[in-house]
Amino acid sequence: LDADVALGIIEPVPQNTPTKWCARMVIVPKKDGTPRRTVDLQNLNKVTHRETHHTPSPFNIVSVVPPKKKKTVLDAWNGYHSVLLSPEARNATTFITEWGRYRYLRAPQGFHASSDGYTKRFDDITAGFPRLTRCVDDSLLWDNDIATSFWHTLSYIQLCGDSGIVFNPEKFRFAEDSVEFAGFEMTPTGYQPPQRLLKAIEDFPSPTNITGVRSWFGLVNHISFAFAQAPIMAPFRELLTKRQPFYWDTSLETLFQNSKAEIIRSIKNGVTTFEVNRPTCLATDWSRTGIGFTLSQKHCDCPDLDNPFCGGDHWRVTYAGSRFTRNAESRYAPIEGEALALLFGLESCRMFVLGCPKLIVAVDHKPLVQIFNDR
């Protein structure tokens, strides 16, 4: 408390000063064992409006980084605290301790508007800065060599420092070929879930209640949204429907273990970084239970550019996704279903396929091809 008062993050509430709001303080440990102070602002969150600011998904954030680059990662220290609170808003953040009441002078963690407000401010500060991608507190810069990385990084630190943003030196990574960023392990040629998350799936215990099923879905969704929606997860998804009682039998246990192995096998090698000038293939498919797509790029010297299935490791996956069909969609005619899958794939991959000079769309329904030929 004294350290944060000295830093201008919080201040004591003067005695005999009434406040309409007063929350409780909760102390939780950080990863390194040091204490972290949190304040329970749930009641305040219920009666205040949240500023919204669009943030791309982690996959979209990392997919803009070209392959074979030197990558520098910086982590903002207490980023929320770079946003000042107006004097009239401070009393609403009052919290009680054994040593009296305190209130925030800067945006607190746990307040639902802090994240979007801070992210918007950070985005405004860094708008137009070259070769940069960000994910909340984390920033990633990329360059061709170490010398360019040095001056590029120095310029970025100066820009942020002038606006009161401070970086954590313990999490600084300079001009490395492989780094962890936005939940992905980024290598010179692609990105994949870090091994600790794959280990978390492998060691995940069998659910014993609905909360366990939700936790399982949340972990899979964090690593791979496509697999959270894949047919192999359908039996677990049914357990989450309203008024569905929880049950767990040997067949579900077998499917649970098989799904863990399948997910790990399918995503442990990650995906290849998208390169706009490579031949690109979007393959889509529809069934009564779901729709899906894969976006692949050509990494061989085969003369046949129009054949996305020439075998081996020649075409490598850049992106993939799927979802369950809705009740009405499951009753579509095949040509309608295949068109739906194609639309889903194009919309999901729009940041890759818009303006792509060498795009091939592969479907397994001849009548759909004929419609496009007629047009």
Segments and roles (model prediction):
Residues 11-14, 115-156, 160, 226-227, ...:
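Active-site palm subdomain of RNA-directed nucleic acid polymerases
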Residues 283, 287-309:
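Acidic, metal-ligating active-site segments
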